[in-house]
């Protein structure tokens, strides 16, 4: 197996293909590009897994969640415009397996497998379940984790997921070794990928979040343990969006 080939069979292009891209951070198999995903994505090759958490519903009128509550946050400069579905579809075309948190807000195909994060201690102002659209060929899965217990590190990004939740979601993709996140935020995907020893390319257009992500990645790798995670199988969700 060559250095660019992954166990899942996807092939990343040689590093020379990225010659015109200057990374903000590049160490230990994790790369951050500071810029617009619409310009950077066409320059990238294929990946085993797309794992991303778009800032859906941020800076807009609050939108109803599946549970009837509304998701709305203070408008941020990085989200002056709606996140274009073009970015998601371009990223999807570059990955064999795809996990998109908040995918129910976008025009995506029906999914057999929905990943969900149940938050038993969620405040009344926010929904107690968040969903991820996937193309995974397996039954839907749910993780039940307290917000306070799993997210002691709040880094200022409105849609930041707990590291443990993103780590669990990556595990659902099996042997994926190369990961793409075109809407990286504070870099939780890269942090989880580093802990697993996987290669990850992230894109983020706000430099302050690139700085936060780079600082997190410079810290010592902490082993991820799955034995404290409560998992449950739920019925097939082929009719869900």
What are these regions (language model features)?
Residues 1-180, 186-241:
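Class I S-adenosyl-L-methionine-dependent methyltransferase catalytic core
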């Amino acid at each position: 197996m060559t250095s660019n080939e992954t166990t899942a069979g996807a092939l990343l292009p040689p590093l020379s293909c990225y010659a015109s891209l200057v990374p903000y951070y590049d160490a230990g198999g994790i790369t951050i590009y500071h810029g617009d995903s619409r310009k950077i994505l066409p320059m990238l090759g294929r990946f085993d897994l797309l794992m991303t958490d778009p800032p859906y519903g941020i800076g807009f009128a609050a939108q109803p969640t599946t549970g009837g509550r509304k998701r709305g946050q203070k408008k941020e400069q990085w989200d002056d415009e709606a996140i274009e579905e073009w970015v998601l579809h371009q990223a999807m075309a570059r990955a064999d397996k795809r996990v998109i948190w908040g995918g129910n807000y976008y025009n995506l195909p029906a999914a057999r497998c929905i990943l969900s994060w149940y938050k038993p201690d969620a405040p009344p102002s926010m929904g107690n379940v968040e969903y991820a659209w996937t193309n995974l060929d397996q039954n839907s899965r749910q993780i039940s984790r307290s917000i306070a217990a799993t997210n002691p590190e709040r880094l200022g990004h409105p849609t930041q997921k707990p590291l443990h939740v993103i780590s669990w979601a990556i595990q659902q993709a099996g042997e994926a070794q190369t990961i793409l996140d075109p809407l990286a935020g504070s870099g939780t995907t890269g942090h989880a990928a580093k802990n697993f020893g996987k290669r990850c390319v992230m894109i983020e257009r706000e430099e302050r979040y690139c700085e936060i992500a780079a600082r997190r990645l410079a810290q010592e790798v902490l082993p991820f343990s799955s034995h404290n995670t409560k998992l449950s199988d739920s019925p097939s969700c082929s009719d869900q969006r």
